[in-house]
Amino acid sequence: MSFNKNKYQVIRNAISKEVADIAYRYLQISAEADHWMLNNGMTHAGNRLVGNFNEPQVPNSYAKYGDRLMETLLVKTIDVMQKKTGLKLVPTYSYTRLYRKGNILRRHIDRPSCEISTTLNLGGDNWPIFIDPTGSDNVIDEYKNIHKPGAPKGIEVNLKPGDMLIYSGCELEHWREPFEGQLCGQVFLHYNHADGQFAKSNLYDKRPMLGIVK
């Protein structure tokens, strides 16, 4: 499978299973700690330094932008991605989620900071991601999950902990069907083309550096 040909590619063992497990356990602890602090008045829902339990794209999941461990993975994986795909990349941001039973990721495409997107499996129960390689526009209303009649069913991609799917996030629609497991940890690592129009203006998702919130 060639990224240049298909605009998506799977990299097996992009990180080791040991590193994936550390990140997954860290994500679980972060979710539990943030939930406890919110419920016990130690922080508030508007504090961007804690995770989000009410994120509109996937309600009832735990999500966090720019977590420093995940930003480390954002940088750490660039070399293997460039070697496997031939791409030249600059990092924009990371976004991690701990999914729970019944969660759904609706069909969508990404914003310009996600020219090259990845989903990296950290651990938990298997939950395939679907990607439409045709590049066609089928979403009428993402948040109401309304699509055009006859929208392609997409290709199912299954990832084990440490595996990564790379795809053209602004071009290829991607989604997940309702989650039937208990927990699944994923981190989305986003990049721009190093020689593209957003390389300088959008570096670090317009933040002064990695590891800070917007």
Residue positions per predicted region:
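Non-heme Fe(II)/2-oxoglutarate
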Residues: 1-85
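Short, well-ordered beta-strand micro-motif
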Residues: 10-12, 166, 190
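Generic beta-strand or strand-like secondary-structure segments
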Residues: 76-80, 95, 117
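A short coil-to-beta-strand element that immediately follows conserved catalytic motifs
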Residues: 86-95
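Conserved active-site beta-strand element of glycosyltransferases/polysaccharide synthases
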Residues: 98
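Catalytic core of non-heme Fe(II) oxygenases with the double-stranded beta-helix
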Residues: 101-171, 183-186, 194-206
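Short proline/glycine-enriched turn/loop segments at secondary-structure junctions
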Residues: 176-181
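C-terminal helix/juxtamembrane-tail motif
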Residues: 205-214
